[in-house]
Amino acid sequence: MAAAFSSTVGAPASTPTRSSFLGKKLNKPQVSAAVTYHGKSSSSNSRFKAMAAKEVDETKQTDEDRWKGLAYDISDDQQDITRGKGLVDNLFQAPMGDGTHVAVLSSYDYISQGQKSYNFDNMMDGFYIAKGFMDKLVVHLSKNFMTLPNIKVPLILGIWGGKGQGKSFQCELVFAKMGITPIMMSAGELESGNAGEPAKLIRQRYREASDLIKKGKMSCLFINDLDAGAGRMGGTTQYTVNNQMVNATLMNIADNPTNVQLPGMYNKEDNPRVPIIVTGNDFSTLYAPLIRDGRMEKFYWAPTREDRIGVCKGIFRTDGVDEEHVVQLVDTFPGQSIDFFGALRARVYDDEVRRWVSETGVENIARKLVNSKEGPPTFEQPKITIEKLLEYGHMLVAEQENVKRVQLADKYLNEAALGEANEDAMKTGSFFK
């Protein structure tokens, strides 16, 4: 570290040449300092010896450490935009500070919004967790925190099934029951205007969960609707570089879960293993090598009648609906998703809102709701009866049928103006009301 090196200079030291690098001649104090090395001076005609760098403790990082930048992400493409400003033709430059052209100098500047804490009302007693669902999730999470002899445990658990069946909500209940603090991601974060940004975000969120585990807090990475962000939904969607990199990053993490590095740095120390839970509706749209058995354990979630009744009891637990009425409601709409019953409960409050609107006046709604000194309106909990629930349930089913039956887009393409768009209303008798 303290070794000196020689520099050959053609001109004598007494008449130094003009340096194009420094832009000016060396004065005499500079020359005398340059030819002095560890208290020993050389003649003016001898060759220069450069000053040796002072001793630096390599075990401590200081402001003078030339490698300090390795701990930060200096390879960010947004910083490259900043670095290249003024160095390339203006034709290829976007205005700085506009949209995505905001310089982000470090990955650590992305303050994570992924951590989510749960505080449900009567979480364990009031909400139902399906036994099969809980068994699969608890076993997978536990296996990933254990050291099993000669066993390769898949890092990723893929939970897939029909829409609105409560996959994400059931996961949140299990996390809360196990005392897990998940790091959350959604499908919308798996695409970006900058190539490589989603893959970097996955690694960053994974390392955040790893840091929580280091501190003694059980954690996992939870990605909602993976197929919507990284899957191919037919010919109408474009397969981008980010789709490829998201799939490749998840494959790499599944193969090397204890060696996940952030861009711009490399840490030889192993990070704790973090199980990954993903949800989706159709995993056949994902890259096939990602969902192979060694990397992803797959679980198809189709709630049974018992599961549907149990979840619906939790939905109506504060409304005083009798248990036999919940069973009747579930059996009346057997083909509906669990989310249907949550929407059904929300419909019951329509009458209360409608009554408040008539009392307040339509012209006063904005002032009462947005800029009111009295605060937002409060409602007494309406009495929910099985007759009212069945009535609203059939209304929701009718709306679903209308969407499937009245396909106006096809009519607009085939016929002029409205075509026969009002024909459906005439048949149902609601057109002349």
From Swiss-Prot:
Residue range of the transit peptide in the UniProt record, numbered on this chain: 1-53
A GO term, aspect molecular function: ribulose-1,5-bisphosphate carboxylase/oxygenase activator activity
Region spans: Disordered: 1-60
Pfam family, one: RuBisCO_activase_AAA_helical
Bias (Polar residues) ranges: 1-20
Binding residues for ATP: 161-168
Compartment(s) where it occurs, according to its Swiss-Prot or TrEMBL record: Plastid, Chloroplast stroma
Taxonomy, superkingdom: Eukaryota
Gene Ontology CC entries for this record: chloroplast stroma
The UniProt record lists the keyword ATP-binding: yes
Keywords linked to the UniProt accession: ATP-binding, Chloroplast, Nucleotide-binding, Plastid, Transit peptide
Keyword hit for Transmembrane: no
Entry-linked SUPFAM superfamilies: P-loop containing nucleoside triphosphate hydrolases (SSF52540)
InterPro entries the record matches: ATPase_AAA_core, P-loop_NTPase, RCA-like, RuBisCO_activase_AAA_helical
Main function: Activation of RuBisCO (ribulose-1,5-bisphosphate carboxylase/oxygenase; EC 4.1.1.39) involves the ATP-dependent carboxylation of the epsilon-amino group of lysine leading to a carbamate structure.
Family in the record: Belongs to the RuBisCO activase family.
Name the record gives this protein: Ribulose bisphosphate carboxylase/oxygenase activase, chloroplastic
Species assigned in the record: Zea mays
